Amino acid sequence: MDLYLYNTLTKRKEKFEPLNPPYVGMYTCGPTVYNYAHIGNLRTYIFEDILKRVLIYNGYIVKHVMNITDVGHLTSDADEGEDKIEREAKKERRSAWEIAEFYTEAFKRDLKKLNILEPDIWCKATDHIQDFIDLILILERKGYTYRTSDGIYFDTSKVPDYGKLAGQDLENLLPGARVEYNPEKKNPTDFALWKFSPKDVKRQMEWDSPWGVGFPGWHIECSAMSTKYLGQPFDIHCGGIDHIPIHHTNEIAQSEAAYDKPMAKYWLHGEFLIMGEKRMGKSEGNFITLSDLEEKGYHPLSYRYFCLTAHYRSPLKFTWSALEAAQRALFRLYENMKKYPKEEAKYDEKYEEEFHKAINDDLDMPKALAITWELVKDDKLAPEVKRATLLQFDKVLGLSLDNPPEIKIEIPEEIWKLVEERELARKNKDWEKADRIREEIKNRGYIIEDTPQGPRIKKATPLTK
């Protein structure tokens, strides 16, 4: 069965044809480890995990590389401001190396909780400084670089199709239109390959180079490491849509300038998680971590399930009520799995084919979930066949259906039905009915709390009754 994926580079859905079948080289942009990953970041890693699982499901042998940015990512993506890790080190009064190590391990723990398969190769930027220097030297020899007072820059005007990934027009980008204006730059889109350490500041992370003491630019890191481990071109490069206009655009420019061949054949990007009216992000000051969800009683796999309810190329709005619904759905799935006998059985071919078609249509996980529930509700299928088929699906879903965690449903289903009924009344501005339902919920021993992200429900205590 053919697999089709949406390629950001060509702006269309394409049949997936790897360069060297059955092998697939896949590079994903990892975290900048100066803080905990928020659940918006984690949505992207869940999408990439689904992509990897779908590739494996289709019989491909995947070599997956993910970087860890532990130096060089400044507070502005456009080479301005302070290094995020150095800034956090000052704030927490620890070394930059300690900060990077601490948040790297925290990130890996989050991936494990979400059932995200580890990459075959983790590559830390600080372990590859010479690789970055070597790539910059190639670009320098080919005439793509120039020097300013603060670093070595890439001249984007020498790349005729610069901006092709994002569909940007170089000539129409006025100075300062997208990035902070730097009068020493030849073009507003030019970016740093190597930044010099400020003369009056002693950085914790800095290295000697042919151009002077400093540190690598953010974009050069992914170009050098992806080429080192996957060659060029490789099959798939992915990340979040925020990477398209600057980071991935600059990766393509420098990689293709250096090696005179395409960087990657397919480019895939996951959409934002929305909270309120904005995308979730540390810069927006509106982010939630996986630990925050756990503290509120949500299983990490409930968040994974929640992410599967929307297509990876569609924005997903986060509300507590939507997460509650996802957790209840997942827990019902677990309860069903526990009822099915653990007998040897073959999966149902009709359902498997429908599921396979859905995931091969650009990772259509909402449809795949709908097929999953059709299967659960199908009274004609033997329970052991249902179990075998769900386990087959779980190779992609990654919800631990073979070993469901012990769960305790604290809020009964009938209470949630009342909550949903009240939400509908509020939407229709039937305030009298909404108040009546609130009282009924209270009489049954639960308190409802309205928040900007949706209703929160909890068991009443003697103090809250």
Curated annotation (Swiss-Prot):
**Cofactor: record remark:** Binds 1 zinc ion per subunit.
**SUPFAM superfamilies, per the entry:** Anticodon-binding domain of a subclass of class I aminoacyl-tRNA synthetases, Nucleotidylyl transferase
Motif 'KMSKS' region boundaries = 279-283
* CDD domains named in the record: CysRS_core
Name the GO terms of the biological process aspect: cysteinyl-tRNA aminoacylation
Which molecular-function annotations from GO does this UniProt entry contain? ATP binding; cysteine-tRNA ligase activity; zinc ion binding
Q: Which family does it belong to?
A: Belongs to the class-I aminoacyl-tRNA synthetase family.
**Entry protein name:** Cysteine--tRNA ligase
This chain's source organism reads Dictyoglomus thermophilum (strain ATCC 35947 / DSM 3960 / H-6-12)
What is the phylogenetic placement of the source species in the record?
Answer: Bacteria, Pseudomonadati, Dictyoglomota, Dictyoglomia, Dictyoglomales
